[in-house]
């Protein structure tokens, strides 16, 4: 039992209402979040002579304080619990580590709605459909919709500045609402309605409405309209016949689970509109001694309740595990979605086959991850031995990228005991330095990264600096000047200098800013890990630099041309429909823009091409 916390006095003050509790350690860090229908009964269970499992026993020993939040209902408690878990990331809770938002299809609420890919919070007014397992699935669906229903997909900035229809109109994939007279308001909204129905899985309603319109057009002797609608009907039918994998057009998530060697894999199979769109494997962080039932229960709650703002909830969730709080979770999700959501664990027919597929994928992904972890763990041990450290739990690596000193970007990548932690990768735009001064750039990024308070878990054991003794010397100077509350002596600073011909395996490592460095054998597992984190850092930096350079190039290209002022720039962009069409235009096409002579058109064309 804990000596840190007077639980008897605390329990006297606890109500029997539903609510959420947060447990803290001596450092004031939240170490566990839970919810209960009866707070008093639930919290009392932690302090019995015999606790449920080893994890609970360890947790109780570390409790120094408990805070309680009373809620009106158990459903409210469930939602609050998952919000707190996401906020505090307590170490004794099962944590869903991959919290990247899913791509969705967005149908805007503009006068002439547009279709687009969307990620993240739903700030813009409109309708959201999904989720899709990856951006490829979204792009494929948008391309399909473009062939079936001519609804615009261009950005508003392009749409508002068009004076003539673009190529998409010419090939029949947009009805051209940007130009007055090409499509009636009624017809455009009708196509938007078809998109809405199609994305909601109501293909038959789309076909029924199209058939009715075709017959009406034929009766009124509007044979061209009837033929066009007939072609649209045939296209929709071809798509639905090709892509349905079952007769069910419901939205469905199928969840398979595998568990081995303390690691869990939850594989989610996404079925939208009766089609398998794809899948994704998740590896939640599982505290030692956690039962598999708790892993599944917590994962499902976090996955849908924490991510509900970024994803469309399916009509049904299939599991290969019976949840103890299935009814509570189903009612909470139904309340959130405003419609009934079912959770099933004993499906038949096609659903049973889907579940078997999800389970198989979970097992395969788990075997692969265990194999990768074994390699990473071995490399971590070897690197710790080389650097004379007891263990390495966190490493960070920095690199600088620029072109002739312009658009300088620094990157920081993070590895933990299990390898890359991509959600913590960061880029820093560097400014206020002499162009090309890599030392100053490195000093700036290190000050920005470490010149502030850090959680103990975020302090790296090793910091790799991509560069030789000069870069490492800058790092030592920065750390010497830091005035921070955390132990700045903890990180070991290591310089990684490339070989003379920059070949992998010829790297030199420096642990001090003076003296000779040392090299590791080409087959050293420790060297392979250093190369891995160094290459990730380099790729992250150069990608960020290219994006920044491209953005600057595109926005400043016209401004650099003599004779093209703000008014002419505006006329050019409006007439051509944006910067990209202008880049692709010929001299003759540019010369057609009002106010642009043949000579100026040639100058603009040459400047943009070169």
Curated annotation (Swiss-Prot):
As for subcellular location, the record says: Cytoplasm
PANTHER family named among the record's database cross-references? UVRABC SYSTEM PROTEIN C, UVRC/OXIDOREDUCTASE
GO CC annotation terms, alphabetical: cytoplasm; excinuclease repair complex
Family, per entry: Belongs to the UvrC family.
| Protein name, per record | UvrABC system protein C
Q: How does it assemble?
A: Interacts with UvrB in an incision complex.
Print the keywords alphabetically. Answer: Cytoplasm, DNA damage, DNA excision, DNA repair, Excision nuclease, SOS response
Name the predominant localization. Answer: cytoplasm
């Amino acid at each position: 039992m804990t000596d840190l916390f007077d639980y008897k006095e605390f329990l006297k003050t606890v109500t029997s209402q539903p609510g959420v509790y947060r447990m803290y350690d001596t450092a004031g860090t939240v170490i566990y979040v839970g919810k209960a229908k009866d707070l008093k009964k639930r919290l009392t269970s932690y302090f019995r002579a015999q606790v449920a499992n080893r994890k609970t026993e360890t947790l109780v020993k570390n409790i120094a304080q408990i805070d309680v939040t009373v809620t009106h209902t158990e459903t409210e408690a469930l939602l609050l619990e998952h919000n707190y878990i996401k906020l505090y990331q307590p170490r004794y809770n099962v944590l869903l580590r991959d919290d990247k938002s899913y791509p969705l299809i967005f149908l805007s609420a503009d006068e002439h709605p547009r279709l687009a890919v969307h990620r993240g919070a739903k700030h813009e007014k409109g309708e959201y459909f999904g989720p899709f397992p990856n951006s490829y699935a979204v792009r494929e669906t948008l391309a399909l919709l473009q062939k079936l229903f001519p609804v615009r997909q261009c950005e508003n900035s392009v749409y508002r500045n068009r004076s003539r229809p673009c190529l998409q109109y010419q090939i029949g994939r947009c009805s051209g609402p940007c130009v007055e007279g090409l499509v009636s308001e009624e017809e455009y909204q009708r196509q938007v309605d078809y998109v809405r129905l199609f994305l909601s899985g109501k293909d038959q309603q789309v076909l029924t409405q199209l058939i009715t319109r075709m017959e009406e057009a034929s009766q009124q002797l509007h044979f061209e309209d009837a033929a066009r609608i007939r072609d649209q009907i045939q296209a929709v039918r071809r798509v639905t016949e090709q892509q349905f994998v079952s007769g069910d057009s419901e939205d469905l998530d199928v969840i398979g689970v595998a568990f081995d060697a303390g690691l869990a894999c939850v594989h989610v199979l996404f079925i939208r509109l009766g089609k398998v769109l794809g899948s994704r494997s998740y590896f939640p962080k599982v505290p030692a001694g956690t039962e598999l039932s708790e892993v599944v229960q917590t994962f499902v709650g976090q996955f849908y309740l924490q991510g509900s703002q970024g994803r469309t909830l399916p009509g049904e969730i299939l599991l290969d595990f019976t949840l103890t709080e299935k009814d509570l979770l189903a009612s909470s999700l139904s309340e959130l979605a405003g419609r009934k959501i079912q959770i099933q664990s004993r499906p038949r027919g096609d659903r049973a086959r889907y579940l078997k597929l999800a389970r198989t994928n979970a097992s395969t992904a788990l075997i692969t991850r265990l194999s990768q972890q074994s390699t990473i763990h071995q490399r971590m041990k070897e690197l710790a031995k080389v650097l004379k450290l007891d263990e390495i739990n966190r490493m960070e690596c920095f690199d600088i990228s620029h072109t002739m000193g312009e658009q300088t970007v620094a990157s920081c990548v993070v590895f933990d005991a299990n390898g890359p932690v991509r959600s913590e990768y960061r880029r820093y735009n560097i400014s206020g330095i002499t162009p090309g001064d890599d030392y100053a750039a490195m000093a700036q990024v290190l000050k920005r990264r470490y010149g502030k308070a850090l959680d103990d878990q975020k302090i790296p054991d090793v910091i790799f600096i991509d560069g030789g003794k000069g870069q490492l010397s800058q790092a030592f100077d920065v750390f010497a000047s830091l005035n921070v509350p955390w132990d700045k002596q903890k990180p070991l600073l290591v310089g990684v200098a490339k070989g003379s011909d920059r070949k992998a395996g010829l790297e030199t490592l420096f642990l001090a800013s003076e003296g000779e460095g040392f090299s590791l054998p080409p087959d050293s597992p420790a060297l392979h890990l250093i190369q891995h984190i160094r290459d990730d850092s380099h790729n992250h930096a150069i990608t960020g630099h290219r994006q920044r350079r491209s953005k600057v190039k595109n926005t400043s290209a016209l401004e650099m041309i003599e004779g093209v002022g703000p008014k002419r720039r505006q006329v050019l962009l409006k007439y051509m429909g944006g910067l990209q069409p202008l880049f692709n235009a010929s001299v003759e096409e540019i010369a057609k823009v009002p106010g642009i002579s043949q000579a100026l058109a040639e100058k603009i064309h040459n400047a943009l091409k070169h």
